């Protein structure tokens, strides 16, 4: 092999990777945080993405920092994540509740709310199984409920839980 062949190969590989990323759909917090997803509208493209994303990453048990710009293939489509700090995967078994989630950590402000995490989850609560997604919002559930009303989203249709850190978990159940 000539000395220039490995260089040509690496250059070709780099161009192929850049082309793949250029063809990929960009997913950022602005794509995923909107009135539709905050209101648990399950027919939205974003809800479908969160469901597919969870399923794809669940197989790989992915946990990673520095995920921005990385290419992910989910159901034959390529995605590049931007604006997220990390992907985390966790499995919790506590008091007959089994919770498994894959979350995207971020610090994103929209609609006068600070979104800290977007996660897809599956939960088994004493035999009752649920699947969906949730947001962690920096603020108490009462304040989050007021902001939802201001946005025209009825809080009685949402599950707002207080986290151990005093924030709000806005939970949307897709199946269950």
Language-model features and meaning:
Residues 10-18:
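Bacterial N-terminal signal peptides
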Residues 80-150:
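Long, charged/polar, surface-exposed segments that mediate recognition or autoinhibition
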Residues 2-11:
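Bacterial N-terminal signal peptides that target proteins for export
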Residues 142-176:
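Glycine-rich, aromatic-bearing surface loops/beta-hairpins
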Residues 72-75, 82, 133-135, 166-175:
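Generic recognition of long tandem-repeat/solenoid scaffolds
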Residues 23-104:
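Short helix/turn-capping signatures at newly exposed starts of structured segments
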């Amino acid at each position: 092999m000539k000395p220039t062949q490995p260089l040509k190969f690496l250059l070709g590989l780099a161009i192929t990777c850049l082309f793949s990323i250029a063809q990929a759909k960009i997913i950022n917090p602005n794509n995923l945080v909107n009135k539709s997803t905050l209101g648990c509208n399950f027919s939205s493209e974003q809800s479908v993405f969160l469901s597919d994303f969870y399923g794809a990453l669940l197989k790989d048990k992915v946990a990673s920092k520095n995920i921005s710009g990385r290419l992910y293939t989910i159901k034959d489509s390529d995605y590049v994540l931007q604006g997220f700090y990390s992907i985390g995967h966790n499995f919790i078994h506590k008091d007959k509740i089994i919770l498994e989630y894959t979350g995207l950590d971020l610090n994103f402000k929209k609609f006068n709310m600070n979104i800290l995490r977007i996660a897809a989850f599956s939960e088994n609560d004493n035999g009752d199984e649920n699947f969906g997604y949730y947001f962690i919002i920096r603020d108490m559930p009462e304040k989050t409920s007021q902001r939802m009303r201001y946005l025209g989203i009825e809080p009685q249709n949402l599950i707002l839980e207080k986290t151990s850190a005093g924030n709000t978990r806005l939970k949307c159940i897709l199946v269950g």
